[in-house]
Curated annotation (Swiss-Prot):
Keyword terms, alphabetized: Nucleus, Ribosome biogenesis, rRNA processing
Origin species: Aspergillus oryzae (strain ATCC 42149 / RIB 40)
Record gene name: ipi1
Biased segments, Basic residues type: 1-10
Similarity comment: Belongs to the IPI1/TEX10 family.
Principal cellular location given in the protein's record: nucleus
A Gene Ontology term for the protein's cellular component: rixosome complex
Name of this chain's protein: Pre-rRNA-processing protein ipi1
GO biological process: rRNA processing
Residue span of region Disordered: 1-33, 349-369
Function of the molecule: Component of the RIX1 complex required for processing of ITS2 sequences from 35S pre-rRNA.
Highest taxon in the source lineage: Eukaryota
Length: 369
């Protein structure tokens, strides 16, 4: 009985209110911790205290590695840090990491599902040196074309914006690279809904441009970039526009052989003049070929894309409004290209006619026995 009464009293002790007396301190609880001590230092586990802070190159490399993180905010913040580091570097100073090292990590972000990441990626692209981008155009184009044909509409628009930046930086390299001309034009036809000969047989092949406001802005961007792409590929060169007007005033057509072909015998301007032969690469089809000259690009364009793009621009013009104004830029480039191509063809006809009338040919210049 004594032990049970003691246990019962201890249990009731927790539910009884203690009586405080004047001048007597309150009792301390059982879990009381004494914090009256003083310490000159606080030691934390797993803490590294170093006198030297990480260098800017180390931080740059660290943020490059974070671009493959699964967190959208972390990828966006890393892109912002890289953009700030590149933009704030001294003039004519090299990048903390070469473009060839950074670019393979940046390219998959063109297809990123987060809009903020893609927007920050475009800002980073614009901060990179333009001279370094020209050498990496063949690596950029496959990701851009994949974005232009993506199922998500916002990713398609972002890819078109990246293509606009790339044309502004290296337009000649874009249209003359392997697959950069035909494959990119096919992507434009897919985005705009302008079909080629295979799908033109369907009656409902006409794309609708009657969207106003914010819904029509993506289509306007695509038409604007299409005009830029056509201007880079088949736009009439400013320094060669006068050659067409010189046909009747003793121009190149009036020169004798070999003066009329002097440019063929000079040192090439390009770094790899025989790359179009593809001597040591894998066999390529017509879409994967390199079209480095204006004549080659215009020949392929007139045979495969001219009618489809003319039909699409005419439909956009008939819709009127913002779409009609946006299509006027591409229509202007197309008309100038057709006029320039007609002048080139007339010049070739006049040149061949003059050679025939003079009776001068390559066989006439060969030594006779």
């Amino acid at each position: 009985m004594g032990s049970s009464a003691k246990k019962k009293k201890e249990k009731q002790k927790d539910f009884t209110k203690a009586k405080l007396k004047v001048g007597k301190a309150k009792g301390k609880p059982e879990n009381f911790t004494d914090t009256s001590f003083k310490s000159k230092g606080i030691v934390l586990n797993q803490q590294s205290l170093t006198l030297n802070a990480p260098t800017s190159n180390t931080q740059f490399t660290h943020h490059v590695s974070l671009l493959s993180s699964k967190s959208d905010s972390q990828r966006r913040d890393s892109l912002a840090h890289l953009t700030t580091s590149i933009s704030s570097r001294p003039v004519n100073s090299p990048l903390p990491q070469p473009v060839s090292v950074i670019l393979p990590t940046l390219l998959p972000l063109i297809l990123d599902a987060n809009t903020g990441v893609r927007t920050q990626l475009l800002k980073l692209f614009r901060a990179l040196p333009q001279s370094d981008i020209r050498d990496h155009v063949p690596q950029l184009l496959p990701y851009i074309r994949a974005g232009m044909t993506h199922l998500a509409a916002d990713i398609r628009v972002s890819a078109v914006e990246v293509l606009s930046w790339l044309i502004d930086v290296a337009g000649t390299e874009v249209v003359s690279s392997a697959g950069g001309w035909i494959k990119t034009l096919n992507c434009f036809l897919s985005v705009l809904g302008w079909h080629t000969e295979e799908s033109a047989k369907w009656s409902a092949n006409r794309a609708s441009f009657g969207k106003s406001g914010a819904k029509g802005q993506p289509m306007m961007k695509v038409l604007t970039v299409l005009a830029e792409f056509l201007n880079a590929g088949i736009g009439a060169p400013a320094n060669e526009a006068q050659d067409v007007d010189m046909l009747g005033s003793g121009g190149v057509a009036g020169w004798e052989f070999p003066l009329c072909q002097t440019a063929v015998h000079m040192v090439p301007d390009t770094a790899a003049p025989y790359a179009y032969l593809n001597l040591f690469g894998q066999p390529r089809d017509e879409e994967g070929e390199m079209y480095e000259t204006w004549e080659d690009r215009y020949r392929v364009f007139s045979n495969r894309f001219l009618r489809a793009i003319q039909r699409g621009l005419e439909n956009a013009r008939q819709e009127g409004g913002e779409m009609g104004r946006a299509s006027s830029g591409a229509s202007k480039v197309l008309k100038e290209a057709v006029a320039y191509g007609t002048g080139i063809a007339d010049r070739d006809i006049v040149s061949s006619h003059d050679s025939t009338s003079r009776g001068t040919s390559i066989h006439d210049l060969e030594p006779k026995e």
